[in-house]
């Protein structure tokens, strides 16, 4: 069984945890449907930059 030689310092612990944070995504409102969505992603209804996406049409059938 692995056993540590010494207790990690507060600095080492902080450096390890420096990447453990929650990212808040930038939100946008679609111009046509007035729907809130993550920026640079399609809305739930399939719109991106005010246009219906082709990919959404194929997946919804």
UniProtKB/Swiss-Prot annotation:
Organism listed in the record: Buchnera aphidicola subsp. Cinara cedri (strain Cc)
UniProt record, GO biological process: translation
Family note: Belongs to the bacterial ribosomal protein bL32 family.
Cellular component terms per the entry's GO annotation: large ribosomal subunit
Gene behind this protein: rpmF
Name by which UniProt lists this protein: Large ribosomal subunit protein bL32
Annotated segments matching region Disordered: 1-20
Gene Ontology MF terms in the entry: structural constituent of ribosome
UniProt keyword terms in alphabetical order: Ribonucleoprotein, Ribosomal protein
Domain of life assignment: Bacteria
Pfam families linked to this entry: Ribosomal_L32p
Biased composition (Basic residues): 7-19
């Amino acid at each position: 069984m692995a056993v540590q030689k010494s207790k990690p310092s507060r600095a080492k612990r902080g450096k390890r945890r420096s990447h453990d944070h929650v990212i808040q995504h930038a939100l946008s409102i679609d111009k046509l449907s007035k729907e809130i969505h993550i920026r640079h992603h399609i809305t739930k209804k399939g719109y991106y930059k005010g246009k219906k996406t082709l990919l959404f049409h194929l997946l919804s059938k």
